[in-house]
Amino acid sequence: MDHALFTHFVGRPRHCRLEMLILDEQVSKRSWDTTVYHRRRRHLPRRRAPCGPQRPAEIPKRRKKAAVLLFWHDLCWLFRRLFFPREDSEPLMSDPARSPEEEE
């Protein structure tokens, strides 16, 4: 039941509430008890945990190497941007400190 109620919310906005059909004796005086609003916070039914020792799957060497290279590439790029800022080839506004009269 909980799982069926949960699937109603998949792909719908968080505030979407579904009115439930509850037997009269289960309905309490508070209105939010008649909605799925609180049931939605429950965990989904879990599968049984696999028994026995579990080995993590090995990451292929090529993918691991690529990830390490990408990390260093991005780190170097970050340092270049921080410590060696690129000069603006076409400044949008001329520098107010240098007036055009000084250049002539």
UniProtKB/Swiss-Prot annotation:
Gene this chain is encoded by: UL17
Tell me the domain of life. Answer: Viruses
Member of which family? Belongs to the HHV-5 UL17 protein family.
Pfam families the record matches = UL17
What name appears for this protein in its UniProt entry? Answer: Protein UL17
